Amino acid sequence: MAGHSKWANIKHKKAKEDAKRGKIFTKLIREITVAARLGGGDKDANPRLRAAIATALANNMSKDTIERAVVKGAGGDESANVEEVRYEGYGPGGVAIIVDCMTDNRNRTVGEVRHAFTKSGGNLGTDGSVAYMFTKRGIISFAPGVDEDALMEVALEAGVEDIITHEDGSIDVYTDPHDFSDIQEVLIEKGFNSENAEVTFDAETKAELDTETAEKVMALIDKLEDLDDVQSVYSNANFTQELIEQIG
C-alpha cells in the first residue's frame, strides 16, 4: 500500500533529537518514572511502562539508565509526583496541535504553552477542540532500503494493523497502542531495527501547507518541544520531503 513519504518527518525529528539528546532523555526518563509509579515496575504487567521502555531503547538509552528510572518510579520517589495534562490548539494555517505535558505546576505549564502558541500566530483551544481529529496508534518506522517483503511477512504475522510503503522506500508499520511494544520486540528479534518507534497520535487527515506556513508551524513545534514540561507534540501538518528541503 503506497502513501505519502513520512521519511522527511522522521529525518527532521531525528536531527532535532540528536541536537537535544539531553532534553529528550529527560523526557523519556520522566515517562518511564511516571509509568512505573502509576502501574508498577513490572513491564510485563504494565503496558504503558513497556511502551515507554521500548521508545527509550529505540532512542539508544542504556538499559542501566532505564532500570534506574523504573526503580525510582516504582519506589514512589517524591520527585516523580507530577500530573499529566493535555493541551489542544491551532497553529499557523489552522494546523491542529496536541501538547502532552507532565508538570508539578499547572499554572506555569499552561502559561508557557499559551505563550508559545500566541507568539507563533496560533491559539490555545479548549479540551476536545482538536483531539477528535487524531487516533492513538503505535508507529514503527523503517528507513529506505529495508527488505519490504520480509518485513511485511514478519509484521503481518505479529498482528500489525497496517503497513504503509512510501514513495521513497521508507515503511511505516502501524499497531494498536497496546500491542506496540510486543510487536516491536518481535521485529527486533527478527533483525528489523527501526529508525523511529513511538506510540503517537496520528491525524486522520493531514493539513497541506505552503512553505511559509510550514516554517511557522515547525517553529511553533520547536518552541513547544523546548519547554521542560512538554513530553510530546502532535500535529496534523503534512511536512512533505519537498517542504523540508525548501525550509532547510
UniProtKB/Swiss-Prot annotation:
One of its GO terms (biological process) is regulation of DNA-templated transcription. The keyword NAD does not apply. It is found in: Cytoplasm. InterPro entries: Integrase-like_N, TACO1_YebC-like_2nd/3rd_dom, TACO1_YebC_N, Transcrip_reg_TACO1-like, Transcrip_reg_TACO1-like_dom3, YebC-like. One of its GO terms (molecular function) is DNA binding. It holds the Pfam family TACO1_YebC_N. Keywords: Cytoplasm, DNA-binding, Transcription, Transcription regulation. It comes from the Bacteria. One of its GO terms (cellular component) is cytosol. Belongs to the TACO1 family. This is Probable transcriptional regulatory protein FTM_1203. It comes from Francisella tularensis subsp. mediasiatica (strain FSC147). The lineage of its organism: Bacteria, Pseudomonadati, Pseudomonadota, Gammaproteobacteria, Thiotrichales.
